[in-house]
């Protein structure tokens, strides 16, 4: 199934927390299919809400029930591009993300990769919306614990547990 159809199937009607990543990876293991980021995000929810999940699918349904959604700055993979091409593609994606933020109107937005902060901040500005914005470290490359702990803090404050 196409990544955007999969992503849309997990979109809640009201988005409380919007996580923004860079792009789905070229490997096809993106958040809503099977990725390490899914597992680390589930770990933050377990710590914040005392929840347990049978598997990734169970977690993703809980994530949706909590009003959480993951979108990407760019909907096409950029991790296999040269740095100049990647930058070009990310800059070209700002207006699209701004439009989606305007339409979703999240209360909280968490940028899930520090290096895309300037693009996402510009998209937030162009959207005309004013969510509380947080920047998380990437959920890999040795930063998993920081990602989980910082996301847990956001969840404890802004995202109530669901049953």
For every predicted segment, state its role.
Residues 1-139:
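A polyanion-binding, active-site-adjacent surface
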Residues 140-150:
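Short, charged, surface-exposed secondary-structure boundary motifs
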Residues 150-163:
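A polyampholytic, Gly/Pro-enriched intrinsically disordered region
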């Amino acid at each position: 199934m196409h990544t955007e159809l999969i992503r849309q199937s997990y979109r809640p009607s009201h988005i409380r927390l919007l996580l923004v990543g860079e792009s789905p990876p070229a490997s096809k293991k993106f958040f809503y299919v099977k990725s390490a980021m899914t597992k680390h995000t589930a770990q933050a929810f377990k710590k914040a809400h005392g929840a347990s999940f049978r598997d990734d699918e169970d977690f993703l349904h809980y994530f949706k029930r909590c009003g959480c959604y993951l979108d990407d700055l760019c909907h096409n993979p950029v991790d296999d591009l040269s740095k100049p091409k990647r930058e070009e593609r990310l800059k070209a994606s700002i207006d699209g993300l701004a439009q989606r933020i305007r339409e979703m109107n999240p209360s909280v937005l968490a940028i899930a990769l520090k290096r895309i902060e300037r693009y996402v901040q510009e998209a937030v500005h162009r959207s005309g919306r004013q969510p509380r914005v947080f920047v998380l470290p990437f959920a890999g490359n040795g930063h998993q614990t920081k990602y989980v702990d910082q996301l847990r803090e956001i969840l404890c404050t802004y995202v109530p547990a669901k049953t």
